[in-house]
């Protein structure tokens, strides 16, 4: 009898220790559909952390490491499910209609909240100042307040019903995806660290990305934009601005650009010719660039594209393709030459006129068989951006990276500014 009592005491102490290991003051609560399996994936503060999942009479304690545990199903025996313990990152994605509400206000240390593809109508993250990642896309959110989440790096809230989004307090954001909502205005001027911005399929009328100098991907397709200036986004690699009302684009300062989808806009043949001439030169082993100025061969804009001189793009190692099937556009009839819009034909291989270095960073030197009276440099739109008189060199350090035309006493050649 004494042995039994001693054993019972040991068992009680063991379970008491186990229970004490769970931090019951730190928890996340879900509103769930009773009788369903709820899929969860957990990441704890430290390896071997005890976490308790409670729903009705169903209680289960699991050991969680400081890495994803792989998703497991937990039976919802009631309309709520509470996850107790030091959970650092929480994933309840892909439960569809089985998760309708989420409350993480009692887990102030939470760094990652991943709750996409449910039917959640509201999320309060005002008590989660340590949050780094919030992925709440594919839900039913009408509002989202992230003003208290100043450490946020990644925000994905696409496919909800948001009419506005304020990210002015989230200066650490590097990725923002608010696509497929009902947003009419988006201010990203404070988000100077953004490298990826996805805001397609909204109702945005203007988009200023001049402060987002680290952008590599910009997707603003299917909005109400009439203009787009990417001159400050010198590291931009991919641009998707299709389905707007944009009338002009200039890529002369986007030396890293490799993919452009600009179909279904207000781009004329002349503007498209200028766009081709402003594309960065990807010859010399660079990956071939792709530009999609038209959706398919049946599109009303196809005749406009065929009226351009596609050779100006292919000469820079760019393929002009239909967006829908990735096939090359052929049959161009245009004759426009990339001369900066000045009406002067580009002169090549003139022995009496040479420039160096090319590409150039600062000082451009010019050698001719006669004294140079005037030097004029034009961008791809024909705007003069630099000039000098009675000189054999010109300082171009102030010019943005891109392609320019140099005119020296009637002779013309092209340079690349690094």
Task: Identify the meaning behind each predicted range.
Residues 1-3, 417-418:
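Positively charged n-region of N-terminal signal peptides that target proteins for export
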Residues 90-92, 111-115, 132-136, 153-157, ...:
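Conserved hydrophobic beta-strand positions in leucine-rich repeat
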Residues 100-102, 123, 144, 165, ...:
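Canonical leucine-rich repeat
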Residues 55-59, 96, 119, 140, ...:
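Solvent-exposed strand-loop boundary residues in beta-sheet-rich modules
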Residues 345-418:
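C-terminal outer-membrane/trafficking sorting elements
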Residues 3-5, 15-112, 129, 144, ...:
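N-terminal capping/linker segments that flank leucine-rich repeat
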Residues 87, 99, 110, 120, ...:
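Conserved hydrophobic position(s) of the canonical leucine-rich repeat
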């Amino acid at each position: 009898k004494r042995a039994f009592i001693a054993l019972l005491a040991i068992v009680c102490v063991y379970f008491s220790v186990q229970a004490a290991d769970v931090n019951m003051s730190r928890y996340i609560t879900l509103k769930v559909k009773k009788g369903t399996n709820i899929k969860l994936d957990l990441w704890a503060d430290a390896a071997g952390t005890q976490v308790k999942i409670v729903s009705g009479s169903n209680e289960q304690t699991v050991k969680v490491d400081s890495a994803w545990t792989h998703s497991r199903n937990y039976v919802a025996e009631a309309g709520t499910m509470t996850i107790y313990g030091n959970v650092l990152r929480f994933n309840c994605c892909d439960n569809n209609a089985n998760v309708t509400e989420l409350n993480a206000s009692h887990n102030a240390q939470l760094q990652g909240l991943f709750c996409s593809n449910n039917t959640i109508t509201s999320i309060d993250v005002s008590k989660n100042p340590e949050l780094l990642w919030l992925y709440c896309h594919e839900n039913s959110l009408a509002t989202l307040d992230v003003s208290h989440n100043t450490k946020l790096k990644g925000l994905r809230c696409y496919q909800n019903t948001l009419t506005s989004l304020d990210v002015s307090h989230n200066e650490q954001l590097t990725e923002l995806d608010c696509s497929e909502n009902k947003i009419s205005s988006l201010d990203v001027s404070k988000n100077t660290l953004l490298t990826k911005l996805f805001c397609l399929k909204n109702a945005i009328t203007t988009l200023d990305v001049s402060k987002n100098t680290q952008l590599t991907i910009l997707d603003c397709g299917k909005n109400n934009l009439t203009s787009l200036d990417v001159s400050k986004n010198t590291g931009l690699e991919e641009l998707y601005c299709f389905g707007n009302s944009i009338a002009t684009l200039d890529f002369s300062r986007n030396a890293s650009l490799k993919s452009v989808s600009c179909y279904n806009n207000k781009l004329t043949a002349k503007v498209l010719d200028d766009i081709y001439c402003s594309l960065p030169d990807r010859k010399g082993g660079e990956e071939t660039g792709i530009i999609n100025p038209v959706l398919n061969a049946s599109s009303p804009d196809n005749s406009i594209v065929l009226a351009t001189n596609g050779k100006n793009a292919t000469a820079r190692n760019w393929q002009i393709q239909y967006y829908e099937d990735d096939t090359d556009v052929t049959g161009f009839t245009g004759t426009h030459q990339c001369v900066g819009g000045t009406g002067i034909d580009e002169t090549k291989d003139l022995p009496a006129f040479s420039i160096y270095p090319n590409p150039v960073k600062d000082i451009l030197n010019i050698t001719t068989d006669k004294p140079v009276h005037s030097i004029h440099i034009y961008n791809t739109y024909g705007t003069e951006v630099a000039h000098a008189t009675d000189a054999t060199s010109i300082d171009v350090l102030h010019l943005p990276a891109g392609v320019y035309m140099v005119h020296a006493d009637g002779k013309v050649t092209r340079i690349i500014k690094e």
